[in-house]
Amino acid sequence: MIFKIEDVTVYFPYDNIYPEQYEYMVELKRALDAKGHCLLEMPTGTGKTIALLSLITSYRLSRPDSPIKLVYCTRTVHEMEKTLGELKLLHDYQVRHLGTQAKILALGLSSRKNLCVNTKVLAAENRDSVDAACRKRTASWVRALSTENPNVELCDFFENYEKAAENALLPPGVYTLEDLRAFGKNRGWCPYFLARHMIQFANVIVYSYQYLLDPKVAGFISKELQKESVVVFDEAHNIDNVCIEALSVSVRRVTLEGANRNLNKIRQEIDRFKATDAGRLRAEYNRLVEGLALRGDLSGGDQWLANPALPHDILKEAVPGNIRRAEHFVHVLRRLLQYLGVRLDTENVEKESPVSFVSSLNSQAGIEQKTLKFCYDRLQSLMLTLEITDTDEFLPIQTVCDFATLVGTYARGFSIIIEPYDERMPHIPDPILQLSCHDASLAIKPVFDRFQSVVITSGTLSPIDLYPRLLNFTPVVSRSFKMSMTRDCICPMVLTRGSDQLPVSTKFDMRSDPGVVRNYGKLLVEMVSIVPDGVVCFFVSYSYMDGIIATWNETGILKEIMQQKLVFIETQDVVETTLALDNYRRACDCGRGAVFFSVARGKVAEGIDFDRHYGRLVVMYGVPFQYTLSKILRARLEYLHDTFQIKEGDFLTFDALRQAAQCVGRVIRSKADYGMMIFADKRYSRHDKRSKLPGWILSHLRDAHLNLSTDMAIHIAREFLRKMAQPYDKAGTMGRKTLLTQEDLEKMAETGVQDMAY
């Protein structure tokens, strides 16, 4: 359908549109017109992605004089592929109606591991090894050496791409990762470097958050992006955590041991170069004296991760004299490693500010703050000079230089925390030194400052007023949408007690109570006997899940569950979990039914959909608070209170409830779908807790469903399933119109009414 929103003609590839999609587009257009940033919470399963893509691409077509670029950030490769699939459909529709003027270039960008087509490189076991294997075949010095020694192995795809030079271009179209690989194989060009090259010409780019938020990656991937770009962070409920992780570094004993080995190897290489090619080291020294850290623009194969500090915090001056000579720099790093080793050798938890840490480092190891700031750039320069390609082997020394650069650059918003062991396993010595960032606004500020509009959107952004405070920005539009429905296809319930009327909760003093564990088990036994197909259970942590499953196994509860449905469990091993998910789906497909045990904040809670028969019921056991005794969390809470006046309890509740909402939202992925949500903890019945759930869940949470026992929940579930068994009328009856036609939109435009009756 084609319709107008004010002066923009919107091309939408479906015959009908949901009222909330239309409203979403109206609010998004307001933000684009104002050239400002916005926060939009849209219920899951209501076509948020296609609404966003339709409006922004149509907005671009309506402003041919000032075309905008869309940068769409997703959390996972699966979401990236899904977004590009939707964009393909939309692009075909627009080209059908507008011809060649609607043609765009859109592509996804991911790591070498996901884009490489060289089978020998792909044989490496992990992402870092794939990067190193690629570098061994594409570095400029390796390619130069191959002219003298034909036995040196190069990458044919990269060589062909380099030979094509300016002609290595992608024709207009929408390219998924699979399309890029196929195109690369067909032309004999490297898809990874081709995609990197095409970013500057593309109208739409879809990639991971890190490509914009992590300075190390953004520094060489996204630095050329124009200001007239609209940046979208999809599924952005955890964006503050992504920002914090981008600027945090952890150092363990194993890191220091690896870094020492790296320095030994670097020292050997320096000695070898002194004997065979001393001029190269001299040239590097002269370059550093002149203040040129790197040799101009590096070719693709030579590029390294950028500086870990944010662009405006990097010093634009010459490297300090005491680390210009390679051997002097190695000596400084040795002293730094010795100092870190001494600090890790402690029996007490220590917490201090970067200023205090740098002062102590200066007095005990003689390393100044300015020297620390340049550690990462100096290491990068040295490794290029020494022509080192085994980048995966040198990760430990890179981590230490990351740490040094960040601790030397930032005085506020960070803490250094040294813990001799994990508090949850105090009998195992495992010292860790963490430079922890507490201020999410630091990493995202360059994005807000640089780009015209930033859209933060998700199904879970409640309470929506907390995000501007956490990220320190002022949105021009901030809106939470409700879900229009022809039938009440979601049924949230709060279970506060078992059939024996004992209260249930995962509060620390109650979670191990045999009565609570028994009631949680009995709830599931009763539910699996009446709910068809798939049931998903989320626990607050891996340790709690392991403990409760072990108890259920001993008491025979697990056996009772398995008489009704097969049981699959998420583990911390990605391969095991993927296999368990695959078998869970097969059990649901063949009618046997299955239960999947998972963990809030785990991989499954964040990125796997349990739509249709894969998830007819989700049980959230407990309130998924973070581990509140964590020293890093305590330091962050202190910082948030002092800087943004966010109370400790408010933040902890907000964080726990967004995770709970994310877990239960996994079961509804469209309006034709249906599912039940059970919040099994007495704390959810308190207004201060449940009020922080998204509006689209709260609007279906009736007062009669707030303080249930197991037998009451069973009765409600039976009634709900009976209702859902009736034929589904997707057009809407009884005045609850949830699909708008083109005529409806035209009428609304005439009357000026934008809010339809839900």
Curated annotation (Swiss-Prot):
GO terms for biological process: DNA repair; nucleotide-excision repair; response to heat; response to UV. It comes from the Eukaryota. A motif (DEAH box) lies at residues 234-238. It is found in: Nucleus. GO terms for molecular function: 4 iron, 4 sulfur cluster binding; ATP binding; ATP hydrolysis activity; DNA binding; DNA helicase activity; metal ion binding. It holds the Pfam family Helicase_C_2. It catalyses: Couples ATP hydrolysis with the unwinding of duplex DNA at the replication fork by translocating in the 5'-3' direction. This creates two antiparallel DNA single strands (ssDNA). The leading ssDNA polymer is the template for DNA polymerase III holoenzyme which synthesizes a continuous strand; ATP + H2O = ADP + phosphate + H(+). Its cofactor is [4Fe-4S] cluster. Gene3D superfamilies: P-loop containing nucleotide triphosphate hydrolases. Expressed at low levels in all tissues. ATP-dependent 5'-3' DNA helicase, component of the general transcription and DNA repair factor IIH (TFIIH) core complex, which is involved in general and transcription-coupled nucleotide excision repair (NER) of damaged DNA and, when complexed to CDK-activating kinase (CAK), involved in transcription by RNA polymerase II. In NER, TFIIH acts by opening DNA around the lesion to allow the excision of the damaged oligonucleotide and its replacement by a new DNA fragment. The ATP-dependent helicase activity of XPD is required for DNA opening. Belongs to the helicase family. RAD3/XPD subfamily. NCBIfam families: rad3. This is General transcription and DNA repair factor IIH helicase subunit XPD. It comes from Arabidopsis thaliana.
